[in-house]
Regions:
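Hydrophobic alpha-helical transmembrane segments of multi-pass membrane transport/permease proteins
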Residues: 1-7, 26-40, 146-152, 203-210
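Hydrophobic alpha-helical transmembrane segments of multi-pass membrane transport proteins
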Residues: 23-97, 143, 151
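Membrane-interfacial helix-loop-helix junctions in multi-pass membrane proteins
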Residues: 17-18, 103, 155-210
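Short helix-capping/hinge motifs at transmembrane helix termini and TM-loop junctions
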Residues: 1-10, 38, 94-106, 132-135, ...
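Transmembrane helix segments
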Residues: 2-3, 131-175
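Hydrophobic alpha-helical transmembrane segments of membrane proteins
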Residues: 10-51, 115-128, 132
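Short cytosolic juxtamembrane segments of multi-pass membrane proteins
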Residues: 219-226
């Protein structure tokens, strides 16, 4: 497989952190994106597997005087809070543990806040969509078959711009919402590394959030009323 550096250097990771630093600089936003994604999905999908199980615990949840959509939205918001806390916990670990220096610098706090909030809500919406789309006993299988591949293709361990020399893959990963989580945090925390345009990141995070929230709420209502 060709080096993502285009063969200009012996190391495929050298030069990714264009403004200095090492692989730790590239990895920091990716690890935070993984923490947000896994925390958000697990906080929604795993409880739903139990609630939609044989005991149908979900029937007790929807007896509250709220619309079904409000119950689904509560799950997304609650998981988003957990995702923000997970990202806050991972940041110091990913910043101080690597042996190579990590060059993190926030140039726009509002952009960082927008990315974290949108990514956290998106992870919860993805968890709701997964939790309402598969049978409870298949949740564990989904983590192995779906979650892990989209993580490795989510620009976690490399910036999206590093895929320039593998053009078909660079275009193909654009359907992966985790790409925009990683790239958004990369643009906010390590702007010296290559990243997508900020406008594109915010637009695609919003698009996937709306799409997955709609799909998740529709699936949640269907499973509750079935």
């Amino acid at each position: 497989m060709p080096h993502m550096s285009g063969g200009a250097t012996m190391s495929p990771v050298a030069g990714m952190a264009g403004g200095g630093g090492g692989f730790g600089t590239v990895l920091l936003p990716g690890l935070m994106a993984v923490a947000i994604m896994f925390s958000g999905i697990a906080a929604v999908a795993l409880p739903l597997a139990q609630e939609f199980g044989i005991t149908r615990e979900i029937d007790d949840r929807v007896m509250c005087p709220l619309p079904i959509a409000a119950v689904a939205m509560e799950k997304i918001i609650f998981s988003a809070i957990q995702s923000v806390l997970a990202a806050a916990l991972v940041f110091p670990l990913a910043y101080y543990i690597p042996s190579t220096p990590v060059l993190a610098h926030v140039t726009s706090w509002w952009f960082l806040g927008a990315v974290v909030v949108l990514a956290s809500l998106l992870a919860g919406a993805l968890g709701l969509t997964i939790g309402t789309s598969v049978q409870p006993k298949q949740i564990g299988l989904i983590f192995g078959v779906v979650i892990m591949p989209i993580t490795f293709l989510g620009c976690v361990y490399y910036p999206w711009t590093a895929l320039t020399h593998i053009r078909w893959l660079q275009i193909g990963v654009l359907v992966n919402p985790i790409v925009y989580m990683s790239e958004g945090l990369r643009a906010a925390l390590t702007p010296t590394t290559g990243h997508m345009p900020e406008v594109m990141i915010l637009a695609m995070l919003t698009f996937f959030l709306v799409l997955l929230t709609w799909a998740g709420m529709r699936g949640f209502a269907r499973r509750v009323l079935s």
